[in-house]
């Protein structure tokens, strides 16, 4: 058995670690803090997750220290945490200063309950809830739940309980990613179009532009198509469907924007976007497709074919933007490096593995790939 206490400074230390982790997890999962989930705002749910994770991290660390000092302590027996639900909710409410009813509502959302058993039958991806409701006023706190992003499990549960929640979660993502994109091009050098702009052909909408940035220094104009899809599951059919749709959508968007510009000209495009005080010089146009989590889909058998489009995932785009810095022609350089990576083909070599079980040898052919240098 394991028992310990902690000072306020120690609690604050693990709370700081948990806050840093949860903010990154929240962004990766695409859970905006301003949406409404059930009875509460998601920011309150996120806050409760921070405090639960801090308790998990503290327990893991203290169990590790105890095992080093007292070898007789059994880690597998000490790590699982059983607790009365009412006491845990009260503890977090006191620790956080939140209303106890608010904490209870957050627990109703993030806990895996006995009534969710059907969900486990159909779910094939990693699922590690922060809290397990045993159905008898007791809960289990599996500290292993911090090994992966817990919001993936929470979002999967939410969608199982209410399929309409997917729209609620997805609706703020475009604005969210647009604002993050514009933060990379701040200052007086750039003009940033604040909202989604539709390109019309007569009375019909041909396509739309999710984001646009104009470089006042060089006359370069960059148009962006923004995508934020979830890929935290292993259903191959769903993954291939998302990959196919992403590649098709980006190709169609590039084709329609190019078609509109060829028919109407760059001057009308800049007026449509509301860009002002354009320098008296030739304007260059660059098209970018940014997907928050994944962009190149050749691994699923699909690829984008548009020659005038550079695609990337969000971390890749940030990396190149930071590497390029205040270059003379920022968008030209960005477009070039992204196109080079987009067209780059890796030389892969299949790898096999052998596992010895008793007197038998199991050989898995082509289980992994290695990258040839």
Locations of regions flagged by a protein language model:
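Intrinsically disordered, low-complexity Ser/Thr/Pro/Gly-rich regulatory segments
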Residues: 1-373
């Amino acid at each position: 058995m394991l028992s310990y206490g902690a000072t306020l400074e120690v609690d604050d230390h693990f709370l700081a670690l948990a806050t840093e982790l949860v903010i990154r997890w929240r962004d990766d999962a695409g859970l905006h803090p301003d949406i409404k989930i059930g009875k509460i705002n998601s920011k309150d749910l996120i806050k409760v997750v921070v405090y639960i994770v801090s308790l998990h991290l503290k327990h893991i660390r203290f169990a590790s220290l105890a095992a080093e000092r007292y070898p007789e302590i059994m880690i597998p027996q000490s790590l699982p945490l059983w607790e009365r639900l009412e006491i845990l909710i009260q503890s977090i409410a006191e620790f956080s200063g939140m209303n106890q009813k608010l904490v209870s509502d957050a627990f109703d959302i993030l806990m895996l309950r006995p009534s969710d058993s059907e969900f486990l039958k159909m779910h094939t991806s990693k699922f590690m809830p922060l809290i397990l409701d045993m159905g008898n006023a007791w809960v289990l706190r599996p500290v292993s739940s911090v090994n992966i992003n817990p919001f993936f499990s929470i979002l999967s549960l939410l969608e199982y309980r209410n399929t309409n929640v997917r729209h609620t979660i997805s609706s703020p993502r475009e604005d969210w990613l647009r604002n993050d994109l514009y933060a990379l091009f701040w200052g007086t050098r750039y003009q940033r179009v604040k909202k989604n702009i539709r390109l019309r052909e007569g009375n019909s909408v041909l396509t739309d532009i999710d984001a646009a940035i104009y470089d006042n220094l060089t006359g370069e104009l960059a148009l962006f198509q923004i995508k934020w899809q979830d890929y935290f599951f292993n259903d191959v059919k769903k993954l291939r469907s998302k990959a196919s749709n992403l590649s098709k959508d980006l190709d169609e968007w590039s084709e329609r924007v190019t078609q509109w510009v060829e028919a109407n000209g760059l001057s009308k495009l800049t007026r449509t976007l509301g860009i002002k005080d354009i320098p008296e010089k030739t304007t260059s146009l660059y098209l970018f497709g940014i997907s928050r989590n994944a962009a190149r889909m050749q691994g699923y058998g699909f690829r984008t074919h548009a020659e005038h489009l550079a695609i990337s995932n969000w971390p890749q785009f940030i990396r190149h933007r930071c590497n390029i810095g205040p270059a003379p022609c920022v968008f030209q350089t960005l477009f070039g490096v992204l196109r080079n990576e987009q067209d780059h083909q890796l030389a892969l070599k299949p790898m096999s593995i052998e596992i010895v079980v008793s007197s038998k040898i199991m050989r898995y052919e082509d289980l992994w790939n290695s990258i040839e240098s």
